[in-house]
UniProtKB/Swiss-Prot annotation:
Active-site feature positions: Y106
Modifications after synthesis and translation: Contains an active site 4-methylidene-imidazol-5-one (MIO), which is formed autocatalytically by cyclization and dehydration of residues Ala-Ser-Gly.
Modified residues (2,3-didehydroalanine (Ser)): S200
Enzyme class: lyase
Enzyme Commission number(s): 4.3.1.24
Gene (name only): ZB8
Record-given protein name: Phenylalanine ammonia-lyase
Length: 713
């Protein structure tokens, strides 16, 4: 088949014609380029951008991390690039000139939406009426949950300025400067939490920013000290001179007819989602460490054969954390000692964690790029094309990229939370956790210590709510505005629900992190107690089994090696609270060693001087006298910081997170003997995560990673 108009055959075969390779008019190439490099490097870039003190905007290069920084009302200040002033003025002048020339333009000389058949020459009055009728939100008392969080409002203000700076919207530069001054003075308009469908933009909430700028009597803002102020006081605090703005034709529409509230909140949500995704990868590796897992699940060949980049990177990050881990070296020795101590393969929550997390990372990363495109887009209507002298009537206000990206992100967050809950459930269950105590109980009396039982119930609650939030918002569209807005994106609603999901994932991450630190401490106790038990048993064995009553060597001395094997095979916390109890396995198994030796002793058992059976009572009596004290001394030494064997965590790449939780945040090892509750400790972690304090220790765990999996060899 011969193709025309410069087109070529698809795959060099006849049948279908496709465009010849050329520039990137459809933007697919740029979208692909944005996904190159590792996700971790992208997160590091975000963190660096978040910490910059100045956010200079000109309409085309705003990043979600910058939005998050300004939204947080920290030190980041906003500056408008002067290069945008001329083009913004040109579009504003074009609107005024076209109206004076009698040109009929939507929202300038016409009514709005389904009533755009109406006409008027009173352009300023039309803009005032637009703001008035869009002020349809409800605030309740102002303190009962009906006000959009200030962080989301600040994000919306920044994004709206950025989109208007491109000069296609017909608004004065001075209005944008005024909004920037409000941001820099930390004066935040009060916007209603609900009332937008993010199609024709976020009309209702954005109208309250316009209301403040124009000095409406019902306009309210929050001052830097948290007090409520009116428009005049807001302008005074922000240092805005010249009084309120009298809107010119198109300016009200330019302010409200955009997607900035949905995309602004989405930006702050995605900044956190990207970091929490990295945290989930690292915590999965720590989970492997404390569970004595098998690190082969991270082997690069497995993931290379699956091809998915998110999975490959997740596995490589976990592989990096586990490479050289002291826990993994110890786990390997345990496996060699007795391969039947645990299943040949770890359960899915560990073994398939890269396969589970990988697609979620890909979704979050794609959503991040989609929202970054959105916050740098011109998304109102009509668009003023000064170069061609026309107003283009379209639908860039349709916030579908926001709704879809947020639905997808929320589903990814729910999946991350589900994995975290599965890992947590294994960790606290002594049927699955390879020797750790039930509920990670850290005290001496398990009958009076139920550890993380309440935390597991809370985690189930968090996970259930998170799975509910994983349901889509965008399939609940209702036709609005006299069936003019008959399809709409629900972008802000989806962003709000995703923000809720992020909060829940933070709760789960905090709880899991505290539990992992508890498990690290329990492994430290376990190793020291086991060493003390071995030493005690060997001392008792030498004292009671080595010789007979005449001082001659006794055959029972050959039991020592088998006694040590039984100690190695037995979980410390299965007997540590009462090591000499015959209801627990340790004493039974030690006795069995002696019994088996006695059964093999033949006729010598009939002689009191050579009988092994005759030694059992003395051996057990001596153990009962010394073993409990040895175990208590070992536990006390760990608690006092004088342990004979140091904690393995200090030799691991995951140590910065442990150090952060234990030393910087001051959390403690939890036991039923103390009054400190799990909630008190995990709340310290939650507050720290909300403040971003976890970011540096998290990235420190990965500072040596070169961005590649280990070679296959």
């Amino acid at each position: 088949m011969e193709c025309e108009n410069g087109r070529v055959s698809a795959n060099g075969m006849s049948g279908l014609c496709v465009a010849a390779p050329r520039a990137d008019p459809l933007n697919w190439g740029k979208a692909t380029e944005e996904m190159t490099g590792s996700h971790l490097d992208e997160v590091k870039r975000m963190v660096a951008e978040y910490r910059q003190p100045l956010v200079k905007i000109e309409g085309a290069s705003l990043r979600i991390a910058q939005v998050a920084a300004v939204a947080a009302a920290g030190e980041a200040r906003v500056e408008l690039d002067e290069s945008a002033r001329e083009r913004v003025k040109a579009s504003s002048d074009w609107v005024m000139n076209s109206m004076m020339n009698g040109t009929d333009s939507y929202g300038v000389t016409t009514g709005f939406g389904a009533t755009s058949h109406r006409r008027t020459k009173e352009g300023g009055a039309l803009q005032r009426e637009l703001i008035r009728f869009l002020n349809a939100g409800a605030f309740g008392t102002g303190t009962d949950g009906h006000v959009l969080p200030a962080e989301a409002t600040r994000a919306a203000m920044l994004v709206r300025i950025n989109t208007l700076l491109q000069g296609y919207s017909g608004i004065r530069f001075e209005i944008l400067e005024a909004i920037a001054k409000l941001l820099n003075a930390n004066v935040t308009p009060c916007l209603p939490l609900r009332g937008t469908i993010t199609a024709s933009g976020d009309l209702v909430p954005l109208s309250y920013i316009a209301g403040l700028v124009t000095g409406r009597e019902n306009a309210v803002a929050v001052a830097p000290d948290g007090s409520k102020v009116n428009a005049a006081e807001a302008f005074k605090i922000a240092g805005i001179q010249g009084g309120f703005f009298e809107l010119q034709p198109k300016e009200g529409l330019a302010m409200v007819n955009g997607t900035a509230v949905g995309s602004g909140l989405a930006s702050t949500v995605l900044f956190e989602a990207n970091i929490l995704a990295i945290l989930a990868e690292v915590l999965s590796a720590v989970f492997c460490e404390v569970m004595n897992g098998k690190p082969e699940y991270t082997d690069h060949l497995t993931h290379k054969l699956k091809h998915h980049p998110g999975q490959i990177e997740a596995a490589a990050i976990m592989e990096h954390i586990l490479e050289g881990s002291s826990y993994m070296k110890h786990a390997k020795k345990l496996g060699e000692l007795d391969p039947l101590m645990k299943p040949k393969q770890d359960r899915y929550a560990l073994r398939t964690s890269p396969q589970w997390l990988g697609p979620q990372i890909e979704v979050i990363r794609a959503a991040t790029k989609s929202i970054e495109r959105e916050i740098n887009s011109v998304n109102d209507n009509p668009l003023i094309d000064v170069s061609r002298g026309k107003a283009l009537h379209g639908g860039n206000f349709q916030g579908t990229p926001i709704g879809v990206s947020m639905d997808n992100t929320r589903l990814a967050i729910a999946a991350i939370g589900k994995l975290m809950f599965a890992q947590f459930s294994e960790l606290v269950n002594d049927f699955y956790n390879n020797g750790l105590p039930s509920n990670l109980s850290g005290g001496r009396n398990p009958s009076l210590d139920y550890g993380f039982k309440g935390a597991e119930i809370a985690m189930a609650s968090y996970c259930s709510e998170l799975q509910f939030l994983g349901n889509p918002v965008t399939n609940h569209v209702q036709s609005a505005e006299q069936h003019n807005q008959d399809v709409n994106s629900l972008g802000l609603i989806s962003s709000r629900k995703t923000a809720e999901a992020i909060d829940i994932l933070k709760l789960m991450s905090s709880t899991f992190l505290i539990a992992l630190c508890q498990a690290v401490d329990l492994r430290h106790i376990e190793e020291n107690v086991k060493s003390a038990v071995k030493s005690c048993v060997m001392t008792v064995a030498k004292k009671t089994l080595s010789t007979n009553s005449t001082g001659d060597l006794h055959v029972a001395r050959f039991c020592e090696k088998d006694l040590l094997k039984e100690i190695d095979r037995e979980a410390v916390f299965a007997y540590a609270d009462d090591p000499c109890s015959h209801n627990y396995p340790l004493m039974k198994k030690l006795r069995n060693v002696l019994v088996e030796r006695a059964l093999a002793n033949g006729a010598a058992e009939f002689n009191a001087d050579t009988s092994v059976f005759a030694k059992v009572a003395q051996f057990e009596e001596e153990l009962r006298a010394t073993l409990p004290g040895a175990i208590e001394a070992a536990r006390a030494a760990v608690e006092n910081g004088t342990a004979a064997i140091p904690s393995r965590i200090t030799e691991c790449r995951s140590y910065p997170l442990y150090r952060f939780v234990r030393e910087e945040l001051g959390t403690k090892y939890l036991t039923g003997e103390k009054t400190r509750s799990p909630g008190e400790e995990l709340n310290k972690v939650l507050v720290a995560i909300n403040e971003g304090k976890h970011i540096d220790p998290l990235l420190e765990c990965l500072k040596e990673w070169n961005g590649e999996p280990l070679p296959i060899c």
